Amino acid sequence: WKDKTFNGYHRADGQVGTKNVWLFIPLVFCENKNIEKLKDIFENELLPKKEVSYKNLLRSLIEEKSVEEVAEKNSNENLLDNIEVKFINHQGGCGGIRQDSELLAKLLAGYVNNPNVAGATVLSLGCQNLQVDIFKKALKEINPNCDKEILIYEQQQIGTTDQMFQMVIKDSYEAIKRANKIERKPAPISKLSIGLE
């Protein structure tokens, strides 16, 4: 097995993932609504649904277009075909005791540190127990060499929800485009991460 390789996504810290994922996560449950809005926006505009592709395929075949024509059209529709975008929400980050927030910070930092994750957009309200500094500290403790692109937005510092959404959408889209350019390259089997840390 020593000479075996797999094609993976190489991260700056030396980890290698089998997937290329961008995460959207809230530090507090109060941001779940905004995460859900972003999910709706990004899934509808950025990530074409498979069912729609299949419907378009059938519609094109009914219109007597060749399978090759349809495949070429569909390949041009999804410009970001080398990355997945995932949205996480939870019910913590505010109430409870400080240790609850610290444990949640470690959990969320673990998600971001996963070798399959290229980067993340993190939403914070600003007044919750799980502050941005606690999250950053948890990430550094898990992986001091983590150099992933992490976009963090504190809603109360930005101003209106509309202003925040404009920033988050613009910045995240640009970051996702950059992450989409990461290509699979051979890596030794020893770099393969299996299971949970």
Q: Model-found features: residue ranges?
A:
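Metallocofactor- and cofactor-centric catalytic cores in central/energy metabolism, strongly enriched
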Residues: 1-197
